[in-house]
A protein has these predicted regions:
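Cytosolic-facing regulatory segments adjacent to core modules
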Residues: 1-45, 158-160
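Intrinsic disorder/low-complexity segments enriched in polar/charged and small flexible residues
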Residues: 15-16, 172, 184
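Homeobox/homeodomain signature
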Residues: 8-11, 102, 108, 151, ...
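P-loop NTPase motor core
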Residues: 23-145, 179-183
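Intrinsically disordered, low-complexity boundary segments flanking structured domains
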Residues: 2-12, 113-114, 133-134, 146-150
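P-loop/Walker A phosphate-binding loop and immediately adjacent motor/lid segment at beta-alpha junctions
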Residues: 133-181
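Alpha-helix initiation/capping motif
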Residues: 2-3, 97, 108, 135, ...
């Protein structure tokens, strides 16, 4: 729970700094429209970080059921090209495959759902996993961030995080909160 006063301060700080494009509202979920809007956001607003939340609702050109993974691969390639051409960073949310993930193990890059090229083409891949309620007290953290792939440096890691609902922020377990932009 975030107190209203703090939520209002955070929302006020974000105003004018965050460009949100919801393709469900705009009715433009095809791959060409998404890339066009991203290019517009770079030119018009100077956006340099992009988030695509899930490929499942995207509409791909020339897609049939049997070509769905090929279409995902092609679109992921287009996102990589866009990022490199514009010197920006694109985060693509890909949910884990159903099945074996119920066993108590950390996710790996192989658990990422969709086309294998999603992981192959990415420069970085990471997972964010919430702890089960019954385990939080025992372990002392709420979530784990695992760096699954790091093309720049090659190193991977598992980081324990604690969520502070009061300020909507994850911090590394054991590190104190800092002063955030909305607090100034």
């Amino acid at each position: 729970y975030t107190p209203k006063e703090i939520a209002d301060r955070i929302d006020g700080w974000w105003k004018g700094k965050f460009f949100l494009y919801d393709n469900r509202v705009a009715g433009a979920g095809d791959e060409d429209s998404i890339i066009s809007v991203f290019e517009y956001a770079v030119r018009r607003f100077g956006c340099c970080v992009f988030l695509v939340d899930n490929l499942m609702p995207a509409r791909f050109s020339d897609q049939s059921d049997k070509d769905f993974y090929r279409a995902q691969s092609r679109f992921t390639g287009r996102l990589v090209e866009f990022a490199k051409k514009n010197e920006v960073h694109v985060h693509l949310v890909a949910h884990p495959r159903k099945g074996d993930n119920d066993k108590k193990k950390l996710l790996t890059a192989d658990d990422i759902g969709g086309a294998a090229d999603i992981t192959n083409r990415a420069d970085n891949a990471f997972s964010l996993e919430r702890m089960e309620e019954k385990d939080i007290a025992a372990y002392g953290y709420d979530a784990g961030l695992s760096i699954l792939k790091n093309r720049s440096y090659g190193s991977t890691a598992n980081i324990q995080l604690v969520y502070d609902a009061r300020c909507r922020r994850y911090t590394k377990k054991g590190e104190s909160d800092g002063v955030y932009g909305w607090e100034r």
